[in-house]
Amino acid sequence: MEPFKRILALDVGDKTIGMAVSDPLGWTAQGLHTIRRETPEADIQAMKIVIKQYEVTHLVVGLPKNMNGTIGPQAEKVRHFIEQLRPEISCEITEWDERLTTKMAERSLIEADLRRSKRKKIIDTAAAVCILQGYLDFLNR
């Protein structure tokens, strides 16, 4: 039996990138952290470090489609980031529809009774967890 390969999910924004990684069995998503975006080179280097550290073989990147399913300006920025990242890593990359994941993450954090200041610090990581858990649930159904 082939061992499970870890999956890394990214919630890519203009200022930050939230990250989550799958457990070794591929059932659950755990939040890692959020990095502050600097330069494309620094962002890619940060991704390479996490990919190596967690032995990631697959990347799932949230694609923020418009509510009608079309690709808007923010999704184009994410695709541009993916195209910059693709030649630098050996992982398969999957785009995953992330509509409403930030809202879902925020609702969960509010229900957990976290103050606004704390929510603001972890919302991107929580959104990455939602993206990855949705993808894992899809794979495991």
List PLM regions with ranges:
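Phosphate- and other anionic-substrate recognition elements at nucleic-acid/protein interfaces
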Residues: 2-8, 15-141
